[in-house]
């Protein structure tokens, strides 16, 4: 979808850039309310994830990540906005009367037909196992565990590439640059996730950020020593340390955060960038 630029009529909309209007008219049987509790706090009320709180109420759309309607073709009826993700979603009407939401593939328009199964064409929006795909296919919504549903490459503009198949495994290059092995029996959707221009979006003002449930980000150097290792000092003082630290005293800016000795390390051929 296109990006619309605000006219510079008032300061709050200067340099703002938003998505073109994609209406959302969700079906009642495909949505449900969710209780947003915590707002970044744990059971004792202590902040464990910063910069969270507030935000507009949302209805969760049930997305079909499994695509388990085998060999039943469906038609794209609507392309809708989803407040829970950057990607758009499509309402699919299947031939057996079933109606489901899926992630919007890039380039898909209303009226297109999609299908999932083992012997289906390699065309945009179709879902099939990796073993039936040719090398070099661009894919998204990739399963890690068989029949669990897609878990990889689901963000707006995300795309992975099938680069090798050997034995029982397929080798994928993920959007992060990581190269890893996945079972060839796992399914994926052909194509790239839509709304590629989302990285060009500029909210233009702090209030728009607040609607998303994101609170202001404050530098540690302007805090008190009790709140951050960088805090304290007279005036504009430096951080007073050789290297930056997180609010909890751990090394910041480049420290590996992945847990060591995970079972999935054996499947990662090259770490992400």
Curated annotation (Swiss-Prot):
GO biological process, one term: mitochondrial translation
SUPFAM superfamilies: Nucleic acid-binding proteins, Translation proteins SH3-like domain
Ranges where the record places region Disordered: 224-273
GO cellular component: chloroplast; mitochondrial large ribosomal subunit
SMART domains: Ribosomal_L2, Ribosomal_L2_C
InterPro entries on file: NA-bd_OB-fold, Rib_uL2_dom2, Ribosomal_uL2, Ribosomal_uL2_bac/org-type, Ribosomal_uL2_C, Ribosomal_uL2_CS, Ribosomal_uL2_dom3, Ribosomal_uL2_RNA-bd_dom
Keywords: Chloroplast, Plastid, Ribonucleoprotein, Ribosomal protein
Feature: compositional bias, Basic and acidic residues: 262-273
Subcellular location(s) per record: Plastid, Chloroplast
Molecular-function annotations in GO: rRNA binding; structural constituent of ribosome; transferase activity
Pfam families, sorted: Ribosomal_L2, Ribosomal_L2_C
Subunit structure, interactors included: Part of the 50S ribosomal subunit.
PANTHER family linked: LARGE RIBOSOMAL SUBUNIT PROTEIN UL2M (PTHR13691:SF5), RIBOSOMAL PROTEIN L2 (PTHR13691)
Family statement: Belongs to the universal ribosomal protein uL2 family.
Descriptive protein name: Large ribosomal subunit protein uL2cz/uL2cy
Gene for this chain: rpl2-A
């Amino acid at each position: 979808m296109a990006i619309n630029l605000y006219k510079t009529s008032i300061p709050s909309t200067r340099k703002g850039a938003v998505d073109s209007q994609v209406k959302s008219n969700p079906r009642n049987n495909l949505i449900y309310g969710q209780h947003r509790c915590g707002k970044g706090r744990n059971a004792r009320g202590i902040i464990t994830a910063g910069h969270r709180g507030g935000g507009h109420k949302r209805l969760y759309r049930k997305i079909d990540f499994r695509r388990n309607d085998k060999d039943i073709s469906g038609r794209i009826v609507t392309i809708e906005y989803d407040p829970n993700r950057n990607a758009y979603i499509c309402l699919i009407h299947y031939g057996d009367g079933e109606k489901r939401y899926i992630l919007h593939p890039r380039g898909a328009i209303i009226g297109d037909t999609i299908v999932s199964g083992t012997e289906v064409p390699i065309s945009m929006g179709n879902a099939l196992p990796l073993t039936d795909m040719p090398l070099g296919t661009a894919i998204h919504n990739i399963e890690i565990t068989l029949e669990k549903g897609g878990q990889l490459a689901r963000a707006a503009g995300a795309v992975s590439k099938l680069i090798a198949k050997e034995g029982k495994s397929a080798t994928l290059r993920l959007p992060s640059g990581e190269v890893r092995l996945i079972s060839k029996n796992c399914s994926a959707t052909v194509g790239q996730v839509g709304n590629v221009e989302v990285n060009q979006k500029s909210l233009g003002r702090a209030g728009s950020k607040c609607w998303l449930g994101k609170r202001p980000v404050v530098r540690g150097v302007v805090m008190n020593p009790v709140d951050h290792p960088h805090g304290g000092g007279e005036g504009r003082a430096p951080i007073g340390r050789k290297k930056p630290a997180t609010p909890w005293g751990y090394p910041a800016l480049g420290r590996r955060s992945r847990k060591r000795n995970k079972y999935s390390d054996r499947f990662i051929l090259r770490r992400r960038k």
